[in-house]
Amino acid sequence: MTKFEQYFDYVKISLASPEKIRQWGERSLPNGQIVGEITKPETINYRTLKPEMDGLFCEKIFGPVKDWECHCGKYKRFRYKGIVCERCGVEVTESRVRRHRMAYIELASPVTHVWYLKGSTSYIALALDLKVKEVEKIVYFHSYVVTQSNTDINLKYKQLLEGYEWKSLEEEIYQNQDENNQVEVGIGAEAIQKLLKDLDLEHIAETLRSEATNPPKSFKTPSLKFNKKMKRLRLIENFIATGADPSWMVFTVIPVIPPDLRPMVQLDGGRFATADLNEFYRRIINRNNRLSRLKSILAPEIIIRNEKRMLQEAVDSLMDNGRRGRTVVGANNRPLKSLSDIIEGKQGRFRQNLLGKRVDYSGRSVIVVGPHLKLHQCGLPREMALELFQPFVIHRLILQGLVNNIKAAKKMIQKNESSIWNVLNEVIQGHPVLLNRAPTLHRLGIQAFEPILVEGRAIKLHPLVCPAFNADFDGDQMAVHVPLSLEAQAEARLLMLAPHNFLSPATGQPIIMPSQDMVLGCYYLTANNPSQQQGSNQYFASLEDVVMAYEQKKIDLHSYIWARFDGLVDGDQPHDPIKIEKHSDNSTTKFFNNHIIKEDAENQRIVQYIRTTAGRIIFNKIIQESLLA
């Protein structure tokens, strides 16, 4: 595999010049021959099933179809590496070069890029300070445009003329033609290219900047004209900053992507299935070759113009099928996938293949609630954990001397021997895993947890972290990733562990908050419920006795009972007792609404009972244990 020892800081996407596009596709073979231009629309020969020369799958341009074998078969095998066959001109190399070698089509007439003509903002129209409809009329051969003005005939620069207007003026112009006072009129993408080339970016930017210093008086509703000028200024400044030429928005050369990215495969019945892009490229080459031939035989201007317009439409459909004009369809009236369709959307190259790559050491499963878990823990199915941590398990098995090599360790894992689970438990101790729930809309969408092995095939998640993931348990799925290096593990533990992320990055408010079932459970434990009276007004020697009586179903959860309690009672009840009883030994019993205190002769407390419920005791016990832990 080729490795590039070239380090870079960033990737920049910008306009490509025609020279740059040629540079992508052109290659100099070891024998000095320069290849790269595609001139024929043919793909493969249907008798030999080999790519046609100078066609869309040409082996001379893109490289051999079979590893270390030329087109004609004269040179085969690795020992001829780098040799160019003198018969067929194919370089003997690996076939995978066909995945990255590009080519180009030299156009007989310039064509505009549909993204810059018909995008959400028409950058060609903005740069030329024309309306989008006016630019479209010029590009698609409906109107002429003045590319060099003449003061005598009162023609303004960039003025549009209809066909009949130009014909009536043409005779007058050529009769009165003066060498110093010429007029030029153009049509199609060539005219647009000339206008874009003639732009003096520095002068336009200076003019627009001076206008920007005098904005309209009404700031609340700035005029559309002023807004357009500011947009144009931004565009011009970007052109200056990037060093791009506005005329590069008009194609003179079309890049052709590598053939293995638009393959053609033979089906069982002998028929061929091909990528849609090949059809677009074929149409462009056919129309381009026809236009070159018409130009060479000096065909009438109307025929040449029609061919130029068809070439423009063919390039438009390659870039973005259906953006303008009729959508090109294939078999069964299915619209063909253009370059834009391949790139954009959920199934496009970026979201599907680059951002949504499948990664190793990862798993995916349905989540279920794990109320017994601690906040920093998650339940990982044993089957999944064994697969994810397999390299660590194998390493530990070899270290412990249970096996001698990797093959034996893998066999041991496949047999599901009992000792494996002990080793797995040791391996996952202190090794955090990352849980991610799509869509990851903020940084809390992916957090670290310590795995606990659980039975079944579902991942168990602590209910308190659900708001951060925006997760619920109605069938949601989550992905598990294993940080492999020590640095990744340390980062996961220090920065990404769930207890370290209890504040929302958006609002700064706590995001780990009890909700739904938890709040309902807390309410139910501590609520008043007069209908439950079993065991009411009984006395218990301790809080533990109350819980035991509840578990044995001697009392109800909401029955009011009296329980001995030696701690401090803090309530909103009146401090004065409602009743005081004096005893023969000078001790007193004070009765309050919710507690009873017995004191000796010196007012020292002997015993205290509180009026509460089993539910409140359980709630208090859970809170106390959590705080002490």
Curated annotation (Swiss-Prot):
InterPro entries for this protein: DNA-dir_RpoC1_gamma, DNA-dir_RpoC_beta_prime, RNA_pol_asu, RNA_pol_N, RNA_pol_Rpb1_1, RNA_pol_Rpb1_3, RNA_pol_Rpb1_3_sf, RNA_pol_Rpb1_clamp_domain
SS bond list: none
Essential cofactor(s): Mg(2+); Zn(2+)
Catalytic activity: RNA(n) + a ribonucleoside 5'-triphosphate = RNA(n+1) + diphosphate
Protein localization: Plastid, Chloroplast
Molecular function via GO: DNA binding; DNA-directed RNA polymerase activity; magnesium ion binding; zinc ion binding
Superkingdom: Eukaryota
GO biological process annotation, one example: DNA-templated transcription
Binding site for Zn(2+): 70, 72, 85, 88
Gene3D superfamilies per the UniProt record, alphabetical: 1.10.40.90, 2.40.40.20, RNA polymerase II, clamp domain, RNA polymerase Rpb1, domain 3
Coiled-coil spans in chain: none
Binding note for cofactor: Binds 1 Mg(2+) ion per subunit. Binds 1 Zn(2+) ion per subunit.
Main location: plastid
Binding site for Mg(2+): 472, 474, 476
Enzyme Commission no: 2.7.7.6
An example Gene Ontology CC term for this record: mitochondrion
Keywords: Chloroplast, DNA-directed RNA polymerase, Magnesium, Metal-binding, Nucleotidyltransferase, Plastid, Transcription, Transferase, Zinc
Subunit details: In plastids the minimal PEP RNA polymerase catalytic core is composed of four subunits: alpha, beta, beta', and beta''. When a (nuclear-encoded) sigma factor is associated with the core the holoenzyme is formed, which can initiate transcription.
Role according to the record: DNA-dependent RNA polymerase catalyzes the transcription of DNA into RNA using the four ribonucleoside triphosphates as substrates.
Family indicated by similarity: Belongs to the RNA polymerase beta' chain family. RpoC1 subfamily.
Name of the protein in question: DNA-directed RNA polymerase subunit beta'
Protein's organism: Pyropia yezoensis
Lineage: Eukaryota, Rhodophyta, Bangiophyceae, Bangiales, Bangiaceae
